[in-house]
Amino acid sequence: SSWSDEINTTSNTTIKPKTTQETITVTKPKSKSVTSQKPISDDEKYFEKNTYWTTNFGPKHRGLVKVKQRDYYSSINNRRNLTVYNTWKYNALSVIRNDKYKLDDVTSVFKRIKRDKNYSRNQFADVIVSFTQDIPYALIDNAIDIYAPVEFIKKYKGDCDTKTIFLYIVLKKFGYDVVILNSWHYGHSILGINLPTSGNNYKYYNGKRYYAWETTYPGWLKGQIPPKVFNMNHWEISLY
């Protein structure tokens, strides 16, 4: 660039500027490449568990079940607002309403199995029930003696009605006609499903037979219940 004329203040001599243009090149230091990680949003944080189970008709399955962390805390907070002074049905419906749309990352495991395997309707119901039967039994340590469905998957343990409530949601998602059967006499909860089978372990409702299914422990088939709770007169449909 051209410099303007300068006056030498110590002499009377006029110093003319250089007419040659000078190019000044400024070299910037190379910047280090920094890879910034995008923070994980609350929508992307999960509790996850690899699961393995054997169906009651033979094949083994596996899958990654997960629930969003924010859904887990929502599940717990809703359940904590319930009390033992409510009816069982009131509490069950409350956790169902709060959690039923928060289980998509669990039901996706069953959707994959349904897509990949040519199972009958009876067999596919067993895939879901045997998955639940395989989750360890545990007594519940809260006021209403129930884990909400999302809470159940995260903790991966639960008691009888925790399991029947979870199955009620999931089986209905896949189009099964199910009810929850409770017995105050036996202090137990089992599933009732409207699928043809043999035997007399069923409750008749609205012209349909809902066959009992023991879902608390592994190995029980549709229509089977333990001998110590076999009297169907002591069972009632608590949720349909």
Which ranges hold each PLM region?
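A structural boundary/capping signal
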Residues: S1-Y240
